[in-house]
Structure formats: C-alpha cells, structure tokens
Amino acid sequence: MILAARSICLAVVLIGAQPAIASDNPSWLNKQMTFKQARRAILRAGWQPIRSDDRDHDYGVVSALHHKGVKEITQCSEGESFCNFYYRKQNECLRLITIGEQLPALKVYDWTSECPDE
C-alpha cells in the first residue's frame, strides 16, 4: 500500500514537471495570415523566437530569411517550401509552419505545440 501511494505521488510530481503546451487554437493566429502578420501577432502575444543554429542557413529560403533577421527559422523543405519557425513563452513552445518560397508570399499553413529538438 505504501509503495502504491509513493508511485502515485511520483507520477503526480513527474506529470506536473512536464512543460505546458501552446493552445491549439490561439484566437490571434489563423491560416489566412502572411508570415509577417503571424510573426507580429506571435511576438505581440509575448512569444520569443527560439534562435536556430546559424550553421544550417546556407541555402534558399532559409538563408534569405535568416539574413533578414528571422533567426527562428529552422528548416524549409524543397518543392512547395514548407518552413518551420519556433517560439517559446515560459514553458510553452509554438511551431509555426508556413508555405511559400519568398518572404512576401509566405503564408501560415499550420501550427503545433512542438518544441524544437535540442
């Protein structure tokens, strides 16, 4: 009985230690936004860009955005150019996914509460 009670207490402590996740449907973010609009809304809502590793920014859309000061970009696929941007607010993470090949044309495709691999 004592062992079971300790296990439950340990489970509660471990669950409580998990980082919180971003709201799946923030009212200030929608799929009709351009990346610039979404980024502005994200920063206004108190999120901070998670700076990515500079060594991975030597080509295409990633390089162009990184040189424009968008340091939170982590990667873009080739072809339709889906790009990932990461933000943090306290213990929460927000991953913004865009589609497009140039900054003015980048549109919000989706978002998740994923944190980048660290």
Kindly label every feature range from the protein language model.
Residues 23-39:
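Short N-terminal segments immediately surrounding and downstream of signal-peptide cleavage
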Residues 46-91:
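A cross-family detector of function-defining hotspots
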Residues 1-8:
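Bacterial N-terminal signal peptides that target proteins for export
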Residues 18-22:
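Sec/Tat signal peptide C-region and signal peptidase I cleavage site
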Residues 34-51:
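Amphipathic alpha-helical segments
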Residues 90-100:
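Low-complexity, intrinsically disordered Gly/Pro/Thr-rich segments
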Residues 99-118:
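A short, surface-exposed interaction/processing loop segment used at functional sites
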